[in-house]
């Protein structure tokens, strides 16, 4: 109506748009968390899975942060992980002793067998020797 010069003032000018509800992410219950943390690892891939689960739980990482980690982002001597999160902000996060033990063994014993001749700095590798993806992590989580 303003464009056609029927009215001079926009009657909706001071009306605020309704706020959309943000849905909370699905969280695991205590039983589900215990099941994940008590995951038994026997193979290189299972040990990788355990290392990922321990690190996510211990450090409160987002899945995107986890799958983008490189080997040099983990400092085993100083017990921390360096993460680039949302907005490319760097965070230094301490790693629990349990997660550190699992990560140490994964990096030294199991990760080299997963490389399959590829050269990559990615910390967590797929069965093809390349960096694991978000979808790959969620698939693993659903299988456990």
Specify the residue positions occupied by each region the protein language model found.
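Conserved catalytic core of the tyrosine transesterase superfamily
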Residues: 1-144
């Amino acid at each position: 109506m303003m464009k056609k010069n029927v009215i001079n003032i926009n009657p909706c000018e001071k009306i605020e748009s309704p706020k959309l509800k943000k849905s909370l992410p699905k969280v695991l219950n205590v039983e589900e968390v215990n099941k994940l943390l008590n995951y038994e690892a026997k193979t290189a891939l299972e040990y990788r899975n355990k290392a990922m689960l321990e690190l996510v739980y211990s450090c409160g990482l987002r899945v995107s942060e986890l799958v983008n980690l490189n080997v040099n982002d983990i400092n085993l001597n100083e017990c921390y992980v360096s993460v680039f999160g949302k907005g490319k902000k760097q965070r230094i996060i301490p790693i629990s002793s349990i997660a550190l033990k699992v990560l140490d063994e994964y990096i030294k014993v199991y990760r080299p067998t997963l490389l399959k001749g590829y050269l990559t700095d990615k910390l967590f590798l797929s069965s093809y020797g390349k960096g694991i993806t978000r979808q790959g992590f969620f698939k693993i989580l659903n299988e456990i």
